[in-house]
Design a protein with these regions (language model features):
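Charged, low-complexity terminal tails
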Residues: 8-9, 27, 41
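Residue-level marker of regulatory loop/turn positions in helix-turn-helix DNA-binding domains and
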Residues: 13, 32-33, 252
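Short, leucine-enriched amphipathic alpha-helices that occur as contiguous helical runs
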Residues: 13, 17-21
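Short amphipathic alpha-helical interface segments
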Residues: 20-31
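N-terminal helix-turn-helix
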Residues: 30, 35-89
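Intrinsically disordered, acidic Ser/Thr/Pro-rich low-complexity regulatory segments
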Residues: 90, 94-356
């Protein structure tokens, strides 16, 4: 699951410089302020001269890990520094038993419904990280109808539920002009069992509905609202899904600056993000943490973006992840993201609802 891939070939900078770089990044993440040599000298757990600190900071600057935005100010980390920090300095933190219990409780509610599980996991990720979160499902041309349920709801209404082989559950209320008695339901289930169950979702369209009309005989006019609703549910399930949670949380991440508006526009339009996630879903990599310019999408090049891929129910593929500024609290956030991803993966591996 979200095991951060260590980037091979990175230049190791030595224990003392790692300690200095780590403290500068921690300070910047916590305060948003640059750190000067005098303050850093007082924070180190061992004695070292201010001149030595300045020399080490200058070397880290020359190596591309620090930058000085103002002549008289301290140093702040570069995008390359965050990558080195994640790969070589921080270690995976452990969640408390209480934290794990609360996350388990939140995810277990929708454990048997893959799409609702992914949606609740996305909302939970946004809540516990303070970032935007997302989930997506790929369009699967082989997904087909596994079950259909017609539930009378009174007042000439009925709830229609469609379950696909890939675990997608879609439902809608439709208006019926006649009572839904045993004869009505018997005819509906007979025709749908013989002609709809096992059909690819993408093939359930209006022309298919029209081709089945004679099978319903005189009842076709009463059946049409249900069949039209079923057609809509199948088309909805046949398409891929991209849902985003907590976009407005990005407005409070000051490190994004003016780029946040381009980022929000990207999330609203979805096209570029859908393309990126679709490309990732088809790649061999199971998880990735893209920092800064590692992201191929221009609007995401000031962000940290974690993505996890899931395979479930044979042909189904989904992604789940977060988007935040580069100044997120990696020590706190990554263990939570990792735990949620592992839990979701466990539930999906166990299999979703099956229609009997």
């Amino acid at each position: 699951v979200l095991t951060i891939e260590k980037r091979g070939g990175a230049v190791m900078i030595g224990e003392r410089r790692e300690a200095i770089l780590g403290m500068i990044i921690d300070y910047y993440i916590n305060t948003g302020e640059p750190l000067g040599s005098k303050t850093l000298c007082s924070m180190l757990p061992y004695s070292i001269s201010s001149a030595t600190i300045r020399n080490e900071m200058a070397l880290l600057t020359n190596m591309g890990f620090l930058e000085q935005r103002h002549t008289s100010g301290g140093r702040v980390p570069t995008k390359a520094a965050y990558r080195y920090y994640v790969d070589n300095i921080i270690s995976s933190g452990a969640l408390t038993e209480y934290e794990m219990m609360k996350l388990d409780e939140a995810l277990s509610i929708n454990a048997s419904d893959p799409e609702r599980l992914l949606a609740s996991a996305s909302e939970l990720l946004s809540e516990v990280t303070g970032c935007a979160a997302f989930f997506s499902t790929l369009k699967d041309p082989y997904d087909c109808i596994q079950g259909i349920e017609l539930i009378p709801a009174g007042n000439n209404k009925a709830m229609l539920v469609m379950l696909s082989l890939g675990g997608k559950i879609k439902s809608s209320v439709c208006n019926i002009a006649c009572p839904i008695d045993d004869e009505f339901k018997s005819l509906f289930y007979k025709v749908t069992k013989e002609h709809f169950i096992g059909m690819p979702l993408s093939e359930i369209d209006l022309s298919f509905i029209q081709s089945t009309a004679p099978l319903f005989g005189a009842a076709i006019f009463d059946m049409l609202p249900i069949l039209s609703t079923l057609c809509s549910l199948c088309q909805e399930a046949a398409n891929g899904t991209l849902s985003i949670s907590g976009e407005t949380k990005l407005l409070s991440q000051s490190e994004l600056g003016g780029s946040v508006y381009n980022l929000l526009a990207l999330l609203a339009q979805k096209d570029k993000l859908e393309a990126l996630l679709s490309q990732f879903a088809r790649a061999k990599t199971g998880s990735v943490l893209m920092l800064g310019d590692e992201n191929p999408v221009y609007e995401l090049r000031n962000t940290a973006m974690a993505i996890q891929k899931f395979k479930y129910n044979n042909n189904q593929t989904a992604t789940l992840g977060i988007i935040g500024s580069l100044r997120i609290d990696y020590k706190s956030i990554l263990p939570r993201v990792d735990y949620i991803m592992k839990t979701v993966n466990q539930y999906l591996s166990e299999g979703g609802i099956r229609y009997e």
